[in-house]
């Protein structure tokens, strides 16, 4: 992904990949420590692995719809707590930052796909609320990776999806007025 981003950035701009496969929200401190000194902006795409950790709950049964919603609310509240703590660490770096939503899964099982897509807004709402409350831009990966060919497997973008994400990041970095502290959603 970072190689794709480097190909679409203006001459002289650099990009570093701090993400680690399998990393979760609580791992952000270690990732931020790896940031090069010359870092000028942060683009945060985190939380998908945390959400995947809750995938088994989609197979649980409930005695009522209210019971199921309360279980999902409990999971969402935990996610929100961790996400806010993570984001405080990011903002502590005093660099302009953007947040990415979590893209929708592409599970081969139709029922799991429907359940996953229905549950994902609980988590993306946390991300967008944090961004909007702090006047930050959002890169909406749900709208960017919107075709089957954008996915290499059920949970990761393909090269084509990566190209689309890289283009959206480059567009956001070139166009967004971070000093205005006004949120804007980027979808390409």
Whereabouts are the PLM-identified features?
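Short active-site-proximal "capping" loops at secondary-structure junctions
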Residues: 20-25, 49
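Secondary-structure junction/capping motif
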Residues: 1-8, 24, 64, 102, ...
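Serine-esterase "nucleophile elbow" of acetyl-processing enzymes
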Residues: 1-21, 33-38
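Alpha-helical cap/lid subdomain in secreted, periplasmic
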Residues: 30-188
């Amino acid at each position: 992904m970072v190689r794709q981003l480097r190909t679409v950035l203006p001459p002289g701009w650099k990009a570093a990949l701090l993400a680690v496969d399998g990393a979760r929200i609580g791992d952000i401190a270690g990732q931020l420590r790896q940031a090069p000194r010359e870092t000028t902006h942060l683009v945060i795409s985190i939380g998908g692995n945390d959400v995947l950790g809750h995938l088994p709950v989609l197979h649980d049964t409930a005695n009522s719809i209210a019971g199921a919603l309360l279980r999902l609310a409990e999971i969402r509240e935990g996610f929100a707590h961790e996400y806010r703590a993570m984001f405080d660490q990011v903002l502590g770096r005093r660099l302009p930052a953007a947040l990415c939503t979590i893209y929708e899964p592409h599970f081969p099982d139709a029922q799991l796909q429907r359940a996953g897509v229905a549950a994902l807004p609980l988590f993306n709402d946390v991300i967008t609320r944090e961004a909007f409350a702090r006047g930050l831009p959002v890169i909406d990966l749900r709208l960017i990776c919107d075709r089957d060919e954008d996915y290499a497997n059920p949970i990761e973008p393909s090269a084509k999806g990566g190209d689309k994400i890289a283009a959206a990041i480059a567009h956001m970095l070139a166009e967004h007025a971070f000093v205005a502290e006004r949120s804007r959603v980027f979808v390409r």
